[in-house]
């Protein structure tokens, strides 16, 4: 009986102000209910409707939006499309401002592009820009093979000769000014040729080919044959008139 009276006296002393007792009891129940809420995990302060308001040190505050509702979360790392910004009061997750970026290091530097996009110097591209090439089968652009301007077209020639033929080939070239980052990256063509008409068809003092001689002889024979046929026709006509 004395023990019960002593316990009751302690309760009375601790709860002299009834309203203060009620407030303490409400705060304890509130912390207990919020503590079991997964939204409040890692929070220093949390709201039932808005989630985390402040995060524990080393965690990042992320404001998640679902339709018209938004609530705060405390995360160890920021989700895709966001990067972590550490501050004196609280660390926050900020949205990447780089187009087609899935994960970024800072506002203007992407470390992982979305699927189907190439990464180059913190930016994302549909294809590697001029002067760059994909590294093997990855979606990363590296320095490609850079070539200089084309030279003028060379002399028209055939079989190392600049005369004696009607048609030949002329060639132009360009030099590699920067080798690619890896040997597996191909370089553009550095030489190309096209058909051309020779300026000098017959070589001075040279002998014509047998093929040309045969062609010329055939023409002469044809002319001689035509002349002989004409003379024969004239003779026949003369004989008929004399008769």
Curated annotation (Swiss-Prot):
Gene3D superfamilies: Hormone Receptor, Insulin-like Growth Factor Receptor 1, Chain A, domain 2 (2.10.220.10), Thrombospondin type-1 (TSP1) repeat (2.20.100.10)
GO biological process: BMP signaling pathway; dorsal/ventral axis specification; positive regulation of canonical Wnt signaling pathway; Wnt signaling pathway
Classification via InterPro entries: Furin_repeat, Growth_fac_rcpt_cys_sf, R-spondin, Rspo_Fu-CRD_dom, TSP1_rpt, TSP1_rpt_sf, TSP1_spondin_dom
Stretches assigned to the TSP type-1 domain: 144-204
Any one Gene Ontology cellular component term annotated for this protein: extracellular space
Residues the record marks as carrying a glycan: 160
Amino acid composition bias (Basic residues), ranges on this chain: 204-224
Residues in FU repeats: 90-134
MF term (GO), any: heparin binding
Keywords of this entry: Developmental protein, Disulfide bond, Glycoprotein, Heparin-binding, Secreted, Sensory transduction, Signal, Wnt signaling pathway
Disordered: annotated segments: 204-243
Disulfide bonds: 40-46, 43-52, 55-74, 78-93, 96-104, 101-110, 113-124, 128-141, 145-187, 156-163, 196-203
Induction text: By Wnt proteins.
Subcellular location: Secreted
Principal subcellular localization: secreted
Signal peptide: 1-21
Record note on domains: The FU repeat is required for activation and stabilization of beta-catenin.
Function: Activator of the canonical Wnt signaling pathway by acting as a ligand for lgr4-6 receptors. Upon binding to lgr4-6 (lgr4, lgr5 or lgr6), lgr4-6 associate with phosphorylated lrp6 and frizzled receptors that are activated by extracellular Wnt receptors, triggering the canonical Wnt signaling pathway to increase expression of target genes. Acts both in the canonical Wnt/beta-catenin-dependent pathway and in non-canonical Wnt signaling pathway. Activates neural markers and promotes muscle formation.
Family per record: Belongs to the R-spondin family.
Oligomeric form and interacting partners: Binds heparin.
Name under which the protein is recorded: R-spondin-2
Organism: Xenopus laevis
Gene: rspo2
């Amino acid at each position: 009986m004395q023990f019960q009276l002593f316990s009751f006296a302690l309760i009375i002393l601790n709860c002299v102000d009834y309203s203060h007792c009620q407030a303490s009891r409400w705060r304890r129940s509130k912390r207990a209910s919020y503590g079991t809420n997964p939204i409040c995990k890692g929070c220093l302060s949390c709201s039932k409707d808005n989630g985390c308001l402040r995060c524990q040190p080393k965690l990042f505050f992320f404001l998640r939006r679902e339709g018209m509702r938004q609530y705060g979360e405390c995360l160890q790392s920021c989700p895709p499309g966001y990067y972590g910004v550490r501050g004196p009061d609280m660390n926050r997750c900020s949205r990447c401002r780089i187009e087609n970026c899935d994960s970024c290091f800072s506002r203007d530097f992407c470390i992982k592009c979305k699927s189907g996009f190439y990464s180059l110097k913190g930016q994302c591209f549909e294809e590697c820009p001029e002067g760059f090439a994909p590294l093997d089968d990855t979606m990363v652009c590296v320095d490609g093979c850079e070539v200089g301007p084309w030279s003028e077209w060379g002399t028209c020639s055939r079989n190392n000769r600049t005369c004696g033929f009607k048609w030949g080939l002329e060639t132009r070239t360009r030099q590699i000014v920067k080798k690619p980052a890896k040997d597996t990256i191909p370089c553009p063509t550095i030489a190309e040729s096209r058909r051309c008409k020779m300026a000098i068809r017959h070589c001075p003092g040279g002998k014509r080919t047998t093929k040309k001689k045969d062609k010329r002889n055939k023409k002469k024979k044809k002319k001689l044959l035509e002349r002989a046929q004409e003379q024969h026709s004239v003779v026949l006509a003369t004989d008929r008139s004399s008769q």
